[in-house]
């Protein structure tokens, strides 16, 4: 995942990924291209075009996003701050399932998180997490979500369960 701020220039700025290319002429945008996940480009300001490897093309306007997965893609309006706040040391969640939160926390804190109870994976969370210590973040989530957890510092594995 990378965030770009590109000044206007005569030559195009192109970000190439295994999913396709994002072409820019002066803009701020985020590119999320993890293996086995949908490719997502989120535009804060300016203009970008996305061309998939199969030649499909989308032009984004500020406040929009292209999502590309399995040779299909769509665009949508989004709150860009949710997708770009990581660059400012925060993670923002709006009615986010616990399962999705886990993916973002695993990447940020370089840990493995295991859910012991399938019933809690769809618990919804709304909030902003400033990038504090991992233990402070866990206590915040525990205080606002009905979960229990244990963390093995040696293996860096967090196990989350229902209370």
Which sequence ranges carry the predicted segments?
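A residue-level detector for the "anchor" residue at the start of short, highly conserved motifs
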Residues: 1-163
């Amino acid at each position: 995942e990378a965030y770009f701020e590109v000044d206007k220039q005569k030559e195009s700025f192109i970000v190439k990924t295994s999913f396709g290319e994002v072409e820019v002429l002066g803009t701020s945008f985020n590119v999320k291209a993890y293996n086995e996940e949908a490719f997502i480009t989120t535009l804060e300001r300016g203009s970008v075009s996305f061309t998939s490897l199969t030649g499909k093309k989308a032009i984004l306007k500020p406040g929009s996003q292209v999502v590309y997965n399995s040779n299909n893609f769509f665009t949508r309006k989004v709150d860009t701050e949710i997708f770009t706040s990581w660059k400012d040391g925060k993670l923002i969640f709006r009615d986010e399932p616990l399962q999705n939160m886990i993916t973002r926390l695993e990447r940020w804190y370089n840990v493995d998180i295991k859910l012991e109870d399938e019933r809690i994976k769809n618990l919804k969370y709304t909030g902003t997490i400033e990038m504090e210590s991992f233990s402070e973040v866990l206590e915040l989530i525990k205080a606002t979500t009905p979960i229990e957890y244990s963390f093995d510092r040696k293996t860096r594995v967090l196990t989350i369960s229902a209370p």
